[in-house]
């Protein structure tokens, strides 16, 4: 059985956020800890409508996030289980921890845009 632990050894530190990631049955599972306030607006540039087009399911285990859609916004807090349909832009508070499940194939385009935009913002 494939599994991932929140304390597992494969930690990726992106400066603003630390993430442990595994692929399980066609889904990417992330344990994320936000170290600085994160507004994903700039990171999602270049995607359709400059919004994440990958659906996500998860739980906020600590902190909160604000998720903006074209026609409304939602706040998700500690203990809340969420579904983010395509077309969202999240913002995370410092100290927020989430466990998130995303279809791996759909997440690929989002991850590529984030890495490209992060490199551009860092001047690399």
Enumerate the language-model features and the residues they cover.
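A cytosolic small-molecule/anion-sensing beta-strand core signal
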Residues: 61-62, 86, 94
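Double-stranded beta-helix
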Residues: 91, 95-124
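Conserved hydrophobic/aromatic beta-strand scaffold that supports enzyme active sites
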Residues: 19-21, 31, 57, 73, ...
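A short, N-terminal "cap"/entry segment at the start of jelly-roll beta-barrel domains
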Residues: 1-42, 48, 122-124
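Short, conserved beta-strand element in jelly-roll/cupin
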Residues: 50-67
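Short strand-coil-strand connectors
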Residues: 25, 68-72, 93-95
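A short, polar/proline- and glycine-enriched secondary-structure boundary/capping micro-motif
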Residues: 41-43, 77-79, 109-112
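Short acidic-glycine-tyrosine-enriched beta hairpin
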Residues: 69-88
């Amino acid at each position: 059985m494939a599994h991932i632990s929140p304390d597992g050894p494969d930690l990726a530190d992106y400066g603003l956020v630390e993430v442990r990631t595994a692929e399980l049955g066609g889904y990417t599972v992330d344990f994320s800890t936000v170290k600085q306030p994160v507004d994903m607006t700039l990171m999602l540039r270049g995607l359709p409508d400059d919004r994440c087009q990958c659906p996500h399911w998860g739980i906020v285990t600590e902190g909160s996030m604000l998720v903006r859609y074209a026609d409304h916004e939602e706040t998700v807090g500690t203990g809340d289980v969420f579904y983010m349909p395509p077309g969202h832009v999240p913002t995370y508070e410092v100290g927020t921890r989430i466990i998130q499940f995303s279809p791996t194939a759909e997440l690929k385009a989002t991850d590529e845009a984030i890495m490209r935009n992060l490199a551009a913002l860092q001047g690399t």
